[in-house]
Every structure is written in structure tokens, then in C-alpha cells.
A protein has these predicted regions:
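Non-globular targeting/processing and membrane-anchoring segments
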Residues: 1-56, 76-86, 99-109, 123-188
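Short glycine-rich or small-residue beta-strand-to-loop segments that form or flank ligand, phosphate
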Residues: 56-62
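Residues immediately flanking
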Residues: 62, 92, 118
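Conserved redox-active cysteine motifs that mediate thiol-disulfide chemistry
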Residues: 63-70
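General small-molecule cofactor/ligand-binding pocket signal
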Residues: 88-90
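Structural microenvironment flanking redox-active thiols in thiol-disulfide oxidoreductases
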Residues: 92-98
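Acidic, Ser/Thr-rich peripheral helices and adjacent loops at domain boundaries
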Residues: 108-118
Length: 188
């Protein structure tokens, strides 16, 4: 795993979502369009509101990246619904040394999400796509047609991707909540 001091250092340089999008206003429109189409259900909002352990979530991204456009706003929606989630963003190429530690399938893919405890101990690393995203891409790309990188994905696929990301946030929250180390620290 990545040393907590490294994660803490990169996190300190990372940006909140809106500031990250402002780094390239010419590309922010695609992100905003996905954000406008994305809504959490009442059940999802309730689950996220119940989180009690603080988690630092660092997204290594590329504002130019189609997968980041399709998934990044979903991550932002999840974080908006829970005061326990501190979500920050870094550009893969700006933080190249850190990103090199997070290769997926041998490449510098994005988005990659680093989930860390309140003290920056790494709990999980996820990326670059959820299972629902891979299934959707396979349906569209493995055959006679090919998807355009910026094309809107079907609403049911987007909802499934949102739920899978939410599941990962929930999994990490339970990991943090049940951690003997953190339970001892918080006396619960």
C-alpha cells in the first residue's frame, strides 16, 4: 500500500471538485451535463448521511478523460451527501509521481480513487471503472459498433455505476467503523 504520509501530502495539494473543474473550463461542460443528470435516491442519501467515520477520498483524474467525465460527477454527488466524506481531486499528469504508484492493468488509467481513514491510512484503491461501466462498454465496443468517448451513457447504466461507487464508499465506511484501531481511538 501507499504510505500514509504520501497520501496526506498529495491530499493537501488536491482540489475540491469545483476548483478541479475550473482548471479547464473548456472541458467542464461535459462534467456539468453528467452532474445535472445525476441524482441520488432518498435511500442512497439516507445511507450516506448515516456515515460517522471521516474518510479522505482522493481521486486521480484527467479532466479530458471520458471515463472521468462519466464517473467523476457521480463521485461528487456521493460526497455531497455525506459530511463524513472529504473528496479531493488531482490531475494524473500534475501528480505524475503519485499516479505512477496507482497503475491499473499496467497503465496510468483514470479515474483511480484512493480511500483513506481520518489519519490517511489507505483503506482501498478502486478504479478505473466499475463493473457496470465495463459491462456497458463491452456491449458497445465488442462488436460491430464503437462508442464515442463523450457520448451520453444510458440512464440505467449510469444508475448502476452510481450504485457501485456508493457500495464502495459504504464498504470503506464499514471498514472504518469496525476497525479495532479506530474503535479504540474513538471509544466506540
Amino acid at each position: 500500500m501507499i504510505d500514509r504520509a504520501v497520501v496526506e501530502s498529495v491530499f493537501a495539494r488536491a482540489m475540491p471538485y469545483e476548483r478541479y473543474l475550473a482548471t479547464d473550463p473548456s472541458r467542464a461542460g461535459g462534467w456539468q451535463a453528467v452532474s445535472d443528470r445525476t441524482a441520488l435516491t432518498e435511500s442512497q442519501r439516507g445511507e450516506l448521511a448515516s456515515f460517522t467515520r471521516r474518510m479522505h477520498v482522493l481521486v486521480v483524474s484527467g479532466i479530458w478523460c471520458g471515463d472521468c467525465v462519466q464517473q467523476g460527477p457521480l463521485l461528487a454527488r456521493i460526497a455531497e451527501a455525506s459530511p463524513a466524506i472529504d473528496l479531493r481531486w488531482v490531475d494524473r499528469d500534475v501528480e505524475a509521481e503519485f499516479s505512477a504508484r496507482l497503475k491499473v492493468c499496467g497503465g496510468g488509467r483514470v479515474p483511480v480513487v484512493v480511500f483513506a481513514a481520518e489519519d490517511f491510512e489507505v483503506c482501498a484503491i478502486a478504479g478505473d471503472r466499475t463493473l457496470a461501466r465495463y459491462r456497458g462498454l463491452a456491449r458497445r465496443q465488442l462488436g460491430p459498433s464503437c462508442e464515442l468517448p463523450w457520448a451520453e451513457i444510458p440512464a440505467d447504466e449510469s444508475a448502476a455505476v452510481l450504485q457501485e461507487w456508493l457500495n464502495e464508499f459504504e464498504r470503506v465506511q464499514w471498514m472504518l467503523r469496525l476497525s479495532p484501531r479506530l474503535r479504540q481511538k474513538h471509544g466506540d
